[in-house]
Amino acid sequence: VRAAAAQGCRVLVSTDHLTLPASMDPRCECQVPARDLPAHQAAFDAARELAAEIAPDMDFIFGFECDWYPGCEHNVAKWAQNAQVKLGSVPWIGAAGDISIAAGEHGCDRIDPADAPGLAAGWIDYSEDMHIWEELGANGVWRAYVDAWCAACESPLAFDSMAHPDLPMRFSQDGWSAPTNVESLWDEMAACAHDTNRRIELSTASLRKGLPDYYPATGLLERFFKAGVSITIGSDAHIASDICFGILEAQKHAFAAGYR
């Protein structure tokens, strides 16, 4: 909150990663565990009081980044019921296994991991475990990702914006280049976002990951514009120093793509 106030931020949305099933994140490494949801809400409420004191003109909004996976609708509705903003994201591809028990809950130790090698499922943005890339190759990951992303757009979940739409670009500078037919995949994504009336996020996080372009890449952003898809702009900050990172430049970039 203090960092956002210092940057002159007008709208700050808290979007920590929502609770996940034990099958996907058994060690609770990338989520707010179900047991911690009340404490997380309390921490936000305390921060909102601070925001009202030091930045009364800033809108501070409670939300979550909600990972889409097959069958997630009930879980997301339950765990994100207090969220004013829900970012939709697709960092996982493939089946998610038994999603009935949240990570850290009683009985979670009996749940088999859904990302075991050979299952063609797992996280596509986790640099410490690249087995899904090694199993499917870049072409396979991209194909599965676009299918999953479109399924997320088509889901009944009320995602307010689809975060970092071309997330597989994450490792494009590390030997996993986008496939030669990526433009046809972009066409699919733009058409799907239009047909499902979804917004997409223009994210500056990619620049902090060493990529030469934003999420989404310029070619995809231009397709979203031509398809009449609205955008939000965010920094996806995980630490205070990244709050509002590159936002003004991203606004200019969106303007160059046609957005007003």
Regions picked out by a protein language model, each given a short descriptive name:
Residues 11-16, 61-65, 87-90, 160-163, ...:
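Active-site neighborhood of phospho(di)ester-bond hydrolases with catalytic His/Asp-centered motifs
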